From Swiss-Prot:
Subcellular location field: Cytoplasm; Mitochondrion intermembrane space
Organism from which the protein derives: Saccharomyces cerevisiae (strain ATCC 204508 / S288c)
Top enzyme class: transferase
Protein name per UniProt: Nucleoside diphosphate kinase
Broad class of where this protein is predominantly found: cytoplasm
């Protein structure tokens, strides 16, 4: 990984998996030119979700959110590339799908805040923390993309 690249954590939530949106969501990141370095289907438990959403523990919506996130499989992914954290959030759209622009994942596939299809890290520090929660170091694959020379100067 070069000094200009970073990694982000993107999760397709149970609603996105159940609705068959996985391939369309992954393709948005691939078409942008980002490199997939880790992927797995996960049934999250309370401990993982409490660590992931630590800033929301104790808030009124937290139990319902955890219940939803445990309701089905989550596709956990790690993407690598230049400015991928910020650009990943742009690709996803606003947290509330009704405030998301058409052309974003949430703008195209979401309606309700509680079913917003995806999660994306909101900072480089959050990305590192979330990647370490969801993946073991050996699950992150370091590989050279042949298309990188066509994407980056």
């Amino acid at each position: 990984m070069s000094s200009q690249t970073e990694r982000t954590f993107i999760a397709v939530k149970p609603d996105g998996v159940q609705r068959g949106l996985v391939s369309q969501i992954l393709s948005r990141f691939e078409k942008k030119g980002y490199k997939l370095v880790a992927i797995k289907l996960v049934k999250a438990d309370d401990k993982l979700l409490e660590q992931h959403y630590a800033e929301h523990v104790g808030k009124p919506f937290f139990p319902k959110m955890v219940s939803f996130m445990k309701s089905g499989p989550i596709l956990a992914t790690v993407w690598e590339g230049k400015d991928v954290v910020r650009q990943g959030r742009t690709i996803l759209g606003a947290t509330n799908p009704l405030g998301s622009a058409p052309g974003t994942i949430r703008g195209d596939f979401g309606i309700d805040l509680g079913r917003n299809v995806c999660h994306g890290s909101d900072s480089v520090d959050s990305a590192e923390r979330e990647i370490n929660l969801w993946f073991k170091k050996e699950e992150l694959v370091d590989w050279e993309s042949n298309q990188a020379k066509w994407i980056y100067e």
